[in-house]
Amino acid sequence: MASIRELHEQLVKKERSAVEITQETLDHIQELEPKLHSFLHITAQQALEQARAVDAKIAAGEEIGLLAGIPIGVKDNMCTKGIPTTCASRILENFVPPYESTVTQKLLDAGAVVVGKTNLDEFAMGSSTENSAYQVTANPWDLSRVPGGSSGGSAAAVAAEECVVALGSDTGGSIRQPASFCGVVGLKPTYGLVSRYGLVAYASSLDQIGPFGKSVEDTAILLKAIAGYDHQDSTSLKVEIPDYVASLKPDLKARSKLRIGIIKETFGEGLDSVVEQAVTKAIEQLQRLGAEVHVISCPNFRYGVPSYYIIAPSEASANLARYDGVKYGWRAPEGDNLLSMYKRTRATGFGAEVKRRIMIGTYALSAGYYDAYYLKAQKVRTLIKQDFENAFKNVDVLVSPTAPTTAFKAGEKTADPISMYLNDLMTIPVNLAGLPGLSVPCGFDEQGLPIGLQLIGKVLREDQLLQIAYAYEQSTSWHLSQPKIS
């Protein structure tokens, strides 16, 4: 599939119509979905209507933006008016939002064509997209393996060219880890840069919406469209949004002395040797492009996972208390009274992983353990943030592997929650600190599975991350590889 810019030029020159591009995309989805299961809902009728509106503008001689007529996937935890939003949970299987999330409204205003809602781990809780109540998404590079999670449907859809770009959400790595597993670009913005209004909450102090793309430029274009202040989100940042696309240049030498820090705690035990080799070569390539490389220590990095799995479940236990079968969503048919209906609805409506995290969170917040667990985890979070602040006194950007391994086999880790949680070892600290993080393809293992390089930036320096990722991407060919889906 062509890039956003290439498709835009084809539309403007009237070489192809938006309807033709949309129909080709829908046909491609129809062909691949029996194997991939990237989408929970395919919105063919609405997509074609949106495409016809773009064609009408072009026919009338009106100017269109870069995203007009571009097929986009949206993770199914973002509210879409009149279109089911299930969060891949049985408890929301019949929920159709009466309003549009801010990010999807921005896409519609830009003329983008939403071709469907993508699969995820239930309520975005997972690292493999195996926790969906409806289907398990396959990795386009190897159908027996997972695409990562929780935004696995979005990552797989972009990798398989079922859409040009897609939206995901990232609470502890849910954009970057699937991007690494599927060989695409994924960016988690600074906390507050993108509105969370209409995003179904998992952990409100950590959740952030971000873009997936086949290339850095496509990712930058989508970020530019969704970033910005929103009065409907109390955590939204009132800041000027730079032109992320204009800052993309293929050479780092134009920058004055770019300093990159290697987080030494992300190398060593638990990291696959093939991942370490690929990331090391990527760092060497950044040096050749003009970057100055330093080794940096973030001593509390290793405590990211244990602190996250107290903070995030605690917030989830509060956020998910609203699902009781009364106002919306699914309700258990049996029940002698209101209390038994509540219990049955939640017991049968939530999956095992969601119930596990609600229980962990409720326990951590209980009177006898609040100080010992929740408050202590918040103190560790502060230490992790301070580690990053100290590191950024000496360097501009930090690098690490995105994930410790390449994509694993479906079913391999489902019986071992701790092993599954460790997939986000490299990404979780970035969320705890509210920083921007980006994963860019940097190689393949001996089985042909993608590997990702993680770039971590200072607050609101997405422009710098995208610039570095773009320079690296343009000097390599990893992003040009395409999975062969048989």
Swiss-Prot record:
InterPro entries: Amidase, Amidase_CS, Amidase_dom, AS_sf, GatA. Gene3D superfamilies: Amidase signature (AS) domain. It catalyses: L-glutamyl-tRNA(Gln) + L-glutamine + ATP + H2O = L-glutaminyl-tRNA(Gln) + L-glutamate + ADP + phosphate + H(+). It comes from the Bacteria. It is an enzyme of class 6 (ligase). Disulfide bonds: none annotated. Keywords: ATP-binding, Ligase, Nucleotide-binding, Protein biosynthesis. GO terms for cellular component: glutamyl-tRNA(Gln) amidotransferase complex. The active site is at K75, S150, S174. GO terms for molecular function: ATP binding; glutaminyl-tRNA synthase (glutamine-hydrolyzing) activity. One of its GO terms (biological process) is translation. Heterotrimer of A, B and C subunits. PANTHER family: GLUTAMYL-TRNA(GLN) AMIDOTRANSFERASE SUBUNIT A, TRANSAMIDASE. Belongs to the amidase family. GatA subfamily. Allows the formation of correctly charged Gln-tRNA(Gln) through the transamidation of misacylated Glu-tRNA(Gln) in organisms which lack glutaminyl-tRNA synthetase. The reaction takes place in the presence of glutamine and ATP through an activated gamma-phospho-Glu-tRNA(Gln). This is Glutamyl-tRNA(Gln) amidotransferase subunit A. The lineage of its organism: Bacteria, Bacillati, Cyanobacteriota, Cyanophyceae, Nostocales. The gene is gatA.
